[in-house]
């Protein structure tokens, strides 16, 4: 350590053989000699707390944290709220003419005594960072109403909000926003969210995790640029959620994740570009309500939804969704999933026999991953003995460890005896019953002579 008390990062290099001093080495303080602009760019990838820790390595860097073009801070890192406020103010008052890459703040309600004052301070900070052309805005701040200036921030690239309130905008113009993540956000009404989405002209990714009382009854996702949509509905079950509707009109959408059992209706338009889908919905049948074949509007909605996702190439289906698909298939034929190559599907315990009803609608399926879930309540009885030839299936994996029960062996038999070009079947076994299951599985006839059975 030198006279400054600097803790330098050093690398030791041995002199080359041609050097006159072959036995001695020398030290190069290469980190200290890096340009400050480059160091700030590297530090931008750390939280502000970690940036400050690194700044103590050198007296030259003592105040460098103020010039890093981003703030990533959680007020829980401070013992007093006033210290937190003072820290943020000092950061924003430094180099006020420079642009900000990111502004990320987390709020701890236990630290702030006066919520109104805290919200006013946050609103002031947001106005400041928008004026400094912030690119990434990430806020977790309960009960804060986002200032209208955010709706017209031309520099913003990503917007991540948690626990805040979005007011009704007069106008939305976010020409650079590509990523939006809204977690437990409360909206003034349906229109506030719809305008936010449609006002992002180059939006690529949208993640929406809804709160129980977000004031949105009809969610319309309309975007000409959206590629990925991840939707998680309210986690509370009750009759007030039975009429929730989600309408998706995104002609370029490639990846879709839907997870909510209470949403009554999912409407998908312009679906030709869809590549991957993860579906965990059951259209309000989660209260034990059985599928009613006479409910024609419900049947039509399910039909249109299945048609809407029928062009997908890779898909995961939850057990509850498979139940709905099976019930629907007993009323009218399922649409063909001609492009589906990879399917991951769950079923409730011994109810695997509904699987063939869906597989016969997948004429080009190559890979299948199956698993079982705990059986929840009484469901529609299954027509047993239904079989279909899995003429395109090449790879199968049974993820849930088998114990050797009769229904499990029937599933394995169905897959081996009805797959003429199957190349590999991978089966996970429970340790307590491995020997018994192994013996039974190895005696099952295989329709494909080249099929390899792997037991894990």
UniProtKB/Swiss-Prot annotation:
LRR repeat start and end residues: 136-163, 185-210, 234-260, 347-372
Residues annotated as domain FBD: 377-429
Full protein name: Putative F-box/FBD/LRR-repeat protein At1g66300
CDD domains the record matches: F-box_AtFBL13-like (cd22160)
SMART domains recorded: FBD
Transmembrane segments: none
Gene3D superfamilies hit by this protein: Ribonuclease Inhibitor
Stretches for region Disordered: 1-23
Keywords from the UniProt entry: Leucine-rich repeat, Repeat
Alphabetized PANTHER family for the sequence: F-BOX/RNI SUPERFAMILY PROTEIN-RELATED, PROTEIN WITH RNI-LIKE_FBD-LIKE DOMAIN
Occurrences of domain F-box (ranges): 28-74
InterPro entries found in the cross-reference section: F-box-like_dom_sf, F-box_AtFBL13-like, F-box_dom, FBD, FBL13/AtMIF1-like, LRR_dom_sf, LRR_FXL15/At3g58940/PEG3-like
């Amino acid at each position: 350590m030198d006279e400054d008390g600097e803790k330098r990062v050093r690398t030791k290099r041995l002199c080359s053989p041609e050097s006159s001093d072959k036995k001695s080495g020398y030290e190069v303080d290469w980190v200290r000699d890096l340009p400050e602009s480059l160091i700030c760019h590297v530090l931008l990838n750390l939280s502000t707390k970690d940036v400050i820790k690194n700044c103590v390595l050198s007296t030259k860097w003592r105040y460098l944290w103020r010039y890093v073009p981003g703030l990533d801070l959680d007020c829980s890192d401070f013992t007093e709220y006033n210290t937190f406020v003072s820290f943020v103010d000092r950061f924003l008052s430094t180099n006020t003419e420079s642009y900000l890459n990111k502004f990320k703040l987390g709020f701890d309600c236990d630290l702030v005594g006066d919520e109104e004052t805290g919200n006013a301070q946050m609103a002031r900070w947001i106005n400041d960072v928008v004026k400094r052309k912030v690119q990434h805005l990430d806020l977790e701040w309960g009960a804060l109403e986002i200032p209208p200036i955010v709706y017209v921030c031309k520099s913003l690239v990503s917007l991540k909000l948690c626990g805040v309130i979005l007011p009704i905008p007069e106008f939305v113009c976010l020409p650079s926003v590509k990523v939006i993540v809204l977690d437990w956000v409360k909206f003034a009404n349906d229109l506030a969210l719809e305008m936010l989405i449609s006002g992002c002209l180059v939006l690529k990714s949208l993640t929406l995790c809804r709160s129980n009382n977000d004031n949105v009854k009809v969610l319309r996702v309309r975007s000409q640029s959206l590629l990925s949509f991840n939707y998680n509905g309210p986690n509370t079950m009750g009759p007030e959620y039975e009429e929730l509707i989600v309408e998706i009109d995104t002609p370029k959408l490639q990846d879709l994740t839907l997870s909510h059992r209470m949403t009554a209706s999912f409407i998908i338009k312009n679906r030709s570009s869809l590549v991957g889908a993860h579906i965990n919905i059951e259209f309000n049948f989660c209260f034990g309500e059985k599928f009613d074949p006479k409910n024609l509007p419900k049947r039509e909605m399910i039909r249109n939804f299945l048609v809407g996702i029928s062009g997908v190439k890779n898909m995961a289906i939850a057990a509850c969704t498979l139940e709905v698909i099976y019930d629907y298939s007993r009323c009218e034929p399922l649409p063909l999933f001609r492009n589906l190559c990879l399917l991951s599907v769950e079923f409730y315990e011994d109810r695997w026999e509904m699987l063939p009803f869906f597989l016969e609608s997948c004429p080009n399926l190559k890979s299948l991953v199956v698993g079982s879930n705990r059986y929840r309540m009484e469901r529609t009885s299954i027509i047993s003995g239904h079989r279909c030839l899995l003429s395109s299936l090449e790879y199968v994996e049974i993820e849930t460890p088998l114990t050797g029960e009769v229904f499990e062996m029937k599933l394995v038999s169905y897959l081996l005896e009805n797959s003429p070009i199957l190349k590999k079947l991978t089966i996970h076994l429970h340790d307590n019953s491995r020997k018994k299951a192994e013996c039974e599985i190895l005696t099952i006839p295989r329709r494909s002579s080249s099929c390899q059975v792997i037991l894990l």
